[in-house]
A protein has these predicted regions:
Chain A
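Short, low-complexity N-terminal intrinsically disordered segments enriched in polar/charged residues
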Residues: 1-21, 26-33
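Short helix-to-loop capping/linker segments positioned immediately adjacent to catalytic or ligand/cofactor-binding
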Residues: 15-16, 71-78, 111-114
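Surface-exposed helix-capping loop/turn segments at secondary-structure junctions
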Residues: 18-26, 74-75, 79, 133
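A solvent-exposed, acidic/Ser-Thr-rich amphipathic alpha-helical stretch
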Residues: 33-103
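A beta-strand edge to alpha-helix "cap/lid" segment located at domain peripheries
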Residues: 84, 89-156
Length: 156, 156, 156
């Protein structure tokens, strides 16, 4: 588990850096061909209500999720983001699959450099090992901060 | 020390997840039978003033601390909490005891999903190894955010 | 790289603790004799504009940076600081030099214990190994939170 821990942390930190640096076209490369990416409110999760805040349930949808960001066809208020990923835990190992979780805090800053809390949540992931690489098969981002006062313009 | 570092981080992350998921009945299990748990303001600590914001100086008090939470007999404004534990350091090793510290940021979110800073502080811990397990013998939570505008309804 | 990762994290956490505990006289000891320490706005960095928010481009300037803090000759509103350093990554190794990055969140708390976001940024570092020690040869702190509503009284 020692190896997985450091590999997993690095995987999460690279993923986070990619988003913070706005390399959105690289984002789908963190997912397996068959994958799911969802943002859910903690309120719904705790009541076993299935409706997500947003959901991609195929790799094509993951690609589509960032297509407009990459092509700059989406008009929205630009913000800087910074991901603080901590409390990384391997919860279960099963052959080439890992169940893992981490807490994620995303701070947004506007173009005047004024910062505020944006996302407070937990990643609940199913990760697969593919050769030397880790890939996300299933990511559920459960957010405490579901009263988000901005549109979810960019991935978490 | 390498082993201790990862074990200690995992211990802290499990402890944090237990609180975030509101498994309060499990909280006393992180402490030794003879233990102390205190929340102190940084203001008092820096002036060597002993008064804590709250203190449990026996395991029974630790159990009592969460008894009302477990039994739902305490009425208070429900909040979600998320612990971000970082900067984990083993400061000293002495036989089966470790002195350790970590920084802790707790973000609270109300039932409408609006998030704010709740606790900003440092854990100053005396940890003992008991078989394969780590247990807290003494936890001092020194908080910078002692101007807490909520009651300390739940443990940190 | 495994060793470097834990050593580097510990180096960052010790550095952070030194600042949080206001041991400013120790701060220059984290730097090599020939060194650079800069705080830059993300706005400027992304446009390749060179002006920093503050810059020390010699060890003497680093010493000078904290001299007034150490001697208590500077009058400013005292604040507590707490560094949350996460997402630590070794980006490149080259002999005894490491390129590394980490995300840094600094929360400030005033003397009444009211906390707020202070610095949200990324360390971009050139670290050298000197015997058993790590030292900073070049630190660029790129801040998203460049609309800082306080003077940069203390180092980051």
């Amino acid at each position: 588990m020692t190896t997985h821990q450091q590999d997993l942390e690095r995987f999460y930190f690279d993923y986070a850096a990619g988003l913070d640096e706005q390399h959105y076209s690289k984002w789908p490369e963190y997912f397996t061909q068959e994958c799911r990416y969802e943002i859910l409110s903690r309120e719904n999760v705790e009541q076993n209500l299935p409706a997500p805040l947003m959901s991609c349930y195929s790799h094509g949808m993951v690609v589509d999720r960032v297509a407009m960001l990459v092509k700059n066809t989406l008009t929205y208020r630009r913000m800087y983001h910074k991901h603080f990923v901590s409390n990384v835990r391997v919860l279960k190992e099963n052959g080439d699959q890992l169940e893992a979780s981490a807490n994620v805090l995303v701070i947004q800053s506007d173009l005047e450099g004024v910062s505020s809390l944006y996302i407070v949540g937990t990643y609940l992931d199913l990760i697969v090992t593919s050769g030397n690489r880790l890939l996300i098969k299933n990511r559920r981002v459960v957010v405490d901060s579901f009263g988000i006062d901005n549109m979810l313009a960019v991935p978490v």
